[in-house]
Amino acid sequence: SGRSRVVQAGDLVLIDDCYNANPVSTKAALDLLSLADGRKVAVLGDMFELGEKEREMHGQVGAYAAEQGIDCLYCAGSLSEEMYRAAKEAGISQAEHFADTDALLAALPELLHPGDSVLIKASHGMGYAKIVEALEK
């Protein structure tokens, strides 16, 4: 479904919210992640259809993740590069940006640790549902 579903996947807690994303819903999802146990990992992707301020809005989300005490930010997509940059500047040392969803998916097994709480959120067109499916296996 991908609408704020919390599931236990092995030794990870997943917050599957990959159906859609805009700045307001993504900040709300980061609020939820900030309350979780363990290391707080945000796996975010591009938010589409935001208009001419889209890069700025992605940057605001990255900075907000840092404000909320998120430990790690991993993101993919061209717009999310701004999110990554802002998160690094705002103090998230464990942040990485990937060119696309497949590159991110390939790297995740090395990046995630047992006990992590992991938010997965992006616009539907980013295909993040396959990340959730892979982690649930």
Please report, for each region that a protein language model flagged, where it lies by residue.
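ATP-dependent carboxylate-amine ligase
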Residues: 1-137
